[in-house]
Structure formats: structure tokens, C-alpha cells
Amino acid sequence: MNEMKFLQHLKEKGFELTDEQQKQFAIYYETLVEWNEKINLTAVTEKEEVYLKHFFDSITPSFYFDFNKVKSICDVGAGAGFPSIPLKILYPHLEITIVDSLNKRINFLNHLSAELNLTNCHFVHDRAETFGKGEYRESFDVVTARAVARLSVLSELCLPLVKKGGHFIALKGAQGEIEVEEGLFAISILGGAVVENHPLTLPEEESMRYILDIEKKRQTPKKYPRKPGTPNKEPLLK
């Protein structure tokens, strides 16, 4: 997906990028490739692939969820900033917090946000399990995560951070439907309920994606998230 097709596909979905936003995505790509030579941020570096598999893919939740109605987003394990930085470019009013366990990635994100002239961005070096126990617990309108872990694990890392009435939006791959079935037990225990599971195919390569919208119906029990590593080793399964 070249830049023109990127803009065209977004326009078809009702998003017309300003010159400034287009420039931000161009700088994002250049900065990503430059830093990727020093630290491992992504295996995808070809320009057309980055625009499709990182930038466009990160924006897909906005086809189904109105981010104009929310203010704060927490992105768990965003790596090189996906999906929250592309969403921030699209919706400049958003206040985003990214939690990542690798300090090198946090350094990259700090540099990137300065290059893109982004404001109201916070980058936290922490494990999601620890972060979800502290002052930010149940404080975000939306929590996002993309391809970090299976949904049964991811729910324990993300739902504790969502305020009651807020949303956990997970970007999942081809196994999205199976993961939802497997994750229903964990989602319920953690205070969530599945609102929608939107299937879509990425343009050009036609690969399957699912955008999962989980609403936080009740507070998460205090025992969750469990200590670092436990959700992955012992997922909440029926």
C-alpha cells in the first residue's frame, strides 16, 4: 500500500488526512526504519508494507469505534507505537499512555513523539501486570492492544486498566473468533462483556483481522492482574 492508496482507502472510510497528518506518517516511517537498525522494533520495514500492516492496520478500530467521544487511551505492549500513535495522529485530542516492558522501545517512543510534535503522550517503562495495580488502575476510557498475546491472557493485562463504562479494544488476527470463544470466561471474571467482534480484511493482501470491542461493565476484582508472568503461564480458562 503506497501513500496514495493509504490516503485513498482512508478517504473511502471518511477520513481525509491533512498535509500535516500526511507528513507525520512520513516522518513516522523514516524514524521507524532508522531506529530499527539500532534496536529491533519490527520485522516489517518495506514502505508499502509499513503503511498497510502497521499504519492502516492500527487505524482500523476507528472504522467501528468513535474515538471523538473519548479522551484517554492506554496502549499495552505497543512496541513501536501500534496502534496508539497512528490513532493519535488521526485524533490529535487523544491523551495516550503507552506501557512497555522494554526501555529501548520507550526511548524510541519519546524520540518519535518529539519528531512528530505530539502532545499529551506518556510512555511508561513497566510490566502491564504491575501497571494495572497502581494509580492508573481503572482510569482509562479505552485500552488497546495489538497482537500482544492470546485474548484470555490479554484481557487480564488490559481490563483492569479500563474505567467502568469504558472499552477494551483488541486488534486480533485470523484466529480472532477462536480467541473470543476461549477468552469469554476471562473477560467475564475481569468485569467485561463482548459488545462487538468486527471481521475485516486488510486491502491488497486480503488478510483477515478482527476488531474486538469489550465494554467494562463492573470493576475488576482486586486480585487481578496477578503477578508478572502468571497470566501468560496460567491463563484464566474455563
From Swiss-Prot:
The keyword Iron does not apply. Its main location: cytoplasm. GO terms for cellular component: cytosol. It is found in: Cytoplasm. Pfam families: GidB. Gene3D superfamilies: Vaccinia Virus protein VP39. Its EC number is 2.1.1.-. Keywords: Cytoplasm, Methyltransferase, rRNA processing, S-adenosyl-L-methionine, Transferase. S-adenosyl-L-methionine binds at G77, F82, A128, E129, R146. InterPro entries: rRNA_ssu_MeTfrase_G, SAM-dependent_MTases_sf. It comes from the Bacteria. It is an enzyme of class 2 (transferase). SUPFAM superfamilies: S-adenosyl-L-methionine-dependent methyltransferases. Specifically methylates the N7 position of guanine in position 535 of 16S rRNA. Belongs to the methyltransferase superfamily. RNA methyltransferase RsmG family. HAMAP family: 16SrRNA_methyltr_G (MF_00074). This is Ribosomal RNA small subunit methyltransferase G.
